[in-house]
Amino acid sequence: MKEILDAIQSQDSTAADFAALSIPESYRAVTVHKDETEMFAGLTTRDKDPRKSLHLDEVPVPELGPGEALVAVMASSVNYNSVWTSIFEPMSTFGFLERYGKLSELTKRHDLPYHVIGSDLAGVVLRTGPGVNAWHPGDEVVAHCLSVELESSDGHNDTMLDPEQRIWGFETNFGGLAEIALVKSNQLMPKPQHLSWEEAAAPGLVNSTAYRQLVSRNGAGMKQGDNVLIWGASGGLGSYATQFALAGGANPICVVSSDQKADICRKMGAEAIIDRNAEGYRFWKDEHNQDPREWKRFGKRIRELTGGEDVDIVFEHPGRETFGASVYVTRKGGTIVTCASTSGYNHEYDNRYLWMSLKKIVGSHFANYREAWEANRLVAKGKIHPTLSKVYSLEETGQAAYDVHRNLHQGKVGVLALAPREGLGVRDEELRERHIDAINLFRDAPAERTSRHSGNV
């Protein structure tokens, strides 16, 4: 790995130099183990601890196939799908790997007793397989996480509709929380030149997801002047939705859970903010019954912030806890666009408020290549900024995942892989200087209370 890192850090390395590098037989990777999928049996979701299930293992470098690339990973980040993988909820990801392994002789590589996780990366191309023409060894890249086969016609208008669509590092193996990653070449995009490795790795999954969900015609199709209710507006996903709303001329109504998260939203430029804890919203009376009076109180508060208007779009991702309220507060003809369901997948709402008011529920999942490319282009132009708040080493990935699981983080949590320290990889100092305050906004925010314990990673 030292040879690879030296080449990346050298100012003089050429594509030929990278092509001449020998690929190691093995690399370090963050994994979960197939024989441990029942380790949290009987525990509540909250009590399942990623620090116990995530391992840092030495694993063999996978075979490189047609249309693929091996990438030296300088940095990655933690998403909720890595948390779900680590706690084996809502199911073990080894079922995904088994099914993928049955697709072809080549995909058998993915069906292993360990799963290398992670759906973000920033790094450098080391090798490309047959049929790859757009990317070459030495290219500095980021990767989006959509893996598709595109052998069916279904995916050719929108690749997210490909029957063999999968999320890399979640439903496939050889993900980005590692020193080397295996990706399809059509996952690659240019690394934003003004960002460090860890900053460039942070937007990836959540930035592309927010773009499709809120901006794209495949999602809510936000337009200028729209009132957009954003749950978790300072979090990993919501922070990008807030930025897209502001950049696109919409009016974000940011829902947060603390004063410091409200302050982050203000610093991003938002004016309408609801601290749901401070204002005491409790949308459920008990485990089985929601409280419509709280929906009405919430809707009244929104109208106070918008000059009497209801919201055109609700950016939904908490799921069960908030979905009834989301449907209620949306204006007639408005859109609830939903993904993830981090508080529970079984949504309940009063259908009278949907059907009689002609509202729409739109499901949104990640992004196609074009949407991911456009989202990354906005980052590269300095229009949208990373929301990186904290960076861990590869050895500390378990703690990073724990912090995300317990909501002890702001924005995105980064992980250094091959990068020996933070701040490396910046190529455009002038653009960086123009946007340095926005780039560091989440880094400067005070950390939530956290508790560190020993673990495997």
Where are each of the predicted segments found?
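Helix-to-beta-strand junctions that scaffold the AdoMet/dcAdoMet cofactor pocket
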Residues: 223, 330-331
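Adenosine-nucleotide cofactor-binding segment
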Residues: 230, 246-321
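Glycine-rich beta-strand-centered segment in the early N-terminal region that forms part
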Residues: 60-77, 91-152
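Hydrophobic/small residue at the entry helix of a nucleotide-binding pocket
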Residues: 209, 236-237, 321-322
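C-terminal hydrophobic helical "lid"/dimerization subdomain
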Residues: 2-22, 324-327, 369-457
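NAD(P)H dinucleotide-binding glycine-rich loop of Rossmann-like/cofactor-binding domains
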Residues: 107-113, 119, 146-232
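A short N-terminal beta-strand-loop micro-motif at the entrance of redox/enzyme domains
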Residues: 4-22, 37-75, 114-116, 131-132
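Rossmann-fold NAD(P)-binding glycine/threonine-rich loop
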Residues: 341-356
